[in-house]
């Protein structure tokens, strides 16, 4: 039999298959990419066993667990674990701390003729490892921020770099008031775990300098890890510039045409277009206080007219009206103020091609220094 695993580095670098014995409610709060949840107990069973443990102690709780997961139910779950083990002979199982639940499942599998190793320390140990991974990267690596006005194409530039930490990608959110996607954001712990694994894999490839977008602490509903965010308040900044008309077209592409297509892909044609329109109206409503009554009313009317025309004919051209107004009257003044406050940290400014080449050259220089 393969030994139980203590090499968390290899687990995440090699995307080793793992099955999670925790209850669904635990799994939903936070897990690891690609892991399959095959719980020993469902949420209700876990709650009953937990209550019994508090009131009567461990022995009674274990007895209740065996009583609840017995007969056909036990056989059904055992078959699912066995199927995973046979499909992934190089994998592992784990529970919260690598304790009783892991041991029970290992024992039942052994009775069925399958010896399958566990992750020592379970979920908690792997989670701690990833938190440490993020903090070590913050302390040991070089970081540079990419900033710029809304619509300059920061994401487009980032996608052309090998050393990017895509906060918005990991958060499944574009970071602005209109940044929600057609699919849900990850749980906070999933966001943090995904970010840490991304850093771990890139560092294993020899990357010691990371580029990330100049974001606030909150990206939609996801919070940037504190150590990283504190560093972002002092990291050097590269500023991306582009013509106003180009920015309008890029926003039209990303936040209207492509986002509507996302909703249609997820929800179907009719519901997708309707839900897209509702999302856009809600996004505008979310900044009502910051816009002020008169400006909100005017831009909302332009948005409403554009959505009506888009839903009627598919023509998105009217969206340029509210996009231009929102940039000139809201986003650009806000970003101009922020740029002024960070002016001393800006080490380069240019268009998309210039910024991309500068960042690539910067990474090459850092790599030579590390060597």
From Swiss-Prot:
Keywords: Selenium, Transferase. The active site is at residue 95. GO terms for biological process: tRNA wobble uridine modification. CDD domains: RHOD_YbbB. It comes from the Bacteria. InterPro entries: Rhodanese-like_dom, Rhodanese-like_dom_sf, SelU. GO terms for molecular function: transferase activity, transferring alkyl or aryl (other than methyl) groups; tRNA 2-selenouridine synthase activity. It catalyses: 5-methylaminomethyl-2-thiouridine(34) in tRNA + selenophosphate + (2E)-geranyl diphosphate + H2O + H(+) = 5-methylaminomethyl-2-selenouridine(34) in tRNA + (2E)-thiogeraniol + phosphate + diphosphate; 5-methylaminomethyl-2-thiouridine(34) in tRNA + (2E)-geranyl diphosphate = 5-methylaminomethyl-S-(2E)-geranyl-thiouridine(34) in tRNA + diphosphate; 5-methylaminomethyl-S-(2E)-geranyl-thiouridine(34) in tRNA + selenophosphate + H(+) = 5-methylaminomethyl-2-(Se-phospho)selenouridine(34) in tRNA + (2E)-thiogeraniol; 5-methylaminomethyl-2-(Se-phospho)selenouridine(34) in tRNA + H2O = 5-methylaminomethyl-2-selenouridine(34) in tRNA + phosphate. PROSITE patterns: RHODANESE_3. Residues 12-135 form the Rhodanese domain. The keyword Transferase applies. It is an enzyme of class 2 (transferase). Its EC number is 2.9.1.3. Belongs to the SelU family. Monomer. Involved in the post-transcriptional modification of the uridine at the wobble position (U34) of tRNA(Lys), tRNA(Glu) and tRNA(Gln). Catalyzes the conversion of 2-thiouridine (S2U-RNA) to 2-selenouridine (Se2U-RNA). Acts in a two-step process involving geranylation of 2-thiouridine (S2U) to S-geranyl-2-thiouridine (geS2U) and subsequent selenation of the latter derivative to 2-selenouridine (Se2U) in the tRNA chain. This is tRNA 2-selenouridine synthase. It comes from Pseudomonas entomophila (strain L48). The gene is selU.
């Amino acid at each position: 039999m393969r030994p139980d695993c203590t090499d968390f580095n290899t687990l995440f670098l090699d995307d080793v298959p793992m099955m999670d014995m925790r209850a669904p409610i635990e799994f939903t709060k936070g897990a690891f990419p690609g892991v399959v949840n095959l719980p020993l107990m469902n949420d209700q069973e876990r709650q009953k066993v937990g209550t019994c443990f508090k009131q009567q102690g461990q022995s009674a709780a274990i007895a209740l667990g065996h009583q609840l997961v017995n007969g056909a139910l036990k056989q059904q779950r055992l078959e699912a674990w066995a199927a995973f083990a046979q499909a992934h002979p190089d994998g592992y199982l784990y529970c919260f701390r690598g304790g009783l639940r892991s041991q029970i499942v290992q024992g039942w599998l052994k009775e069925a003729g399958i010896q399958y190793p566990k992750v020592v320390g379970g979920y908690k140990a792997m989670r701690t490892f990833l938190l440490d991974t993020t903090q070590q990267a913050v302390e040991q690596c070089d970081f540079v921020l990419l900033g710029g006005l809304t619509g300059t194409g920061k994401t487009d530039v980032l996608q052309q770099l090998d050393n990017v930490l895509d906060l918005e990608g990991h958060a499944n959110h574009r970071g602005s008031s209109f940044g929600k996607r057609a699919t849900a954001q990850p749980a906070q712990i999933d966001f943090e775990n995904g970010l840490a694994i991304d850093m771990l894999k890139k560092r294993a490839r020899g990357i010691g300098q990371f580029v990330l977008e100049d974001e606030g602490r909150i990206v939609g509903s996801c919070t940037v890890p504190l150590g990283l965010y504190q560093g972002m308040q002092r990291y050097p900044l590269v500023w991306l510039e582009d013509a106003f008309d180009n920015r309008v077209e890029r926003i039209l592409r990303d936040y209207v045409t492509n986002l509507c297509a996302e909703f249609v892909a997820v929800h179907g044609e009719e519901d997708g277009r309707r839900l897209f329109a509702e999302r856009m109206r809600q996004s505008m409503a979310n900044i009502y206080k910051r816009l002020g009554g008169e400006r909100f009313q005017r831009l909302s009317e332009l948005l409403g007219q554009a959505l009506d025309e888009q839903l009627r004919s598919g023509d998105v051209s009217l969206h340029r009206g509210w996009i231009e107004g929102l940039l000139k009257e809201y986003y650009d003044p806000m970003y101009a103020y922020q740029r002024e406050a960070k002016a001393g940290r800006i080490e380069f400014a240019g268009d998309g091609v210039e910024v991309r080449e500068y960042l690539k050259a910067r990474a090459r220089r850092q790599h030579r220094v590390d060597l």
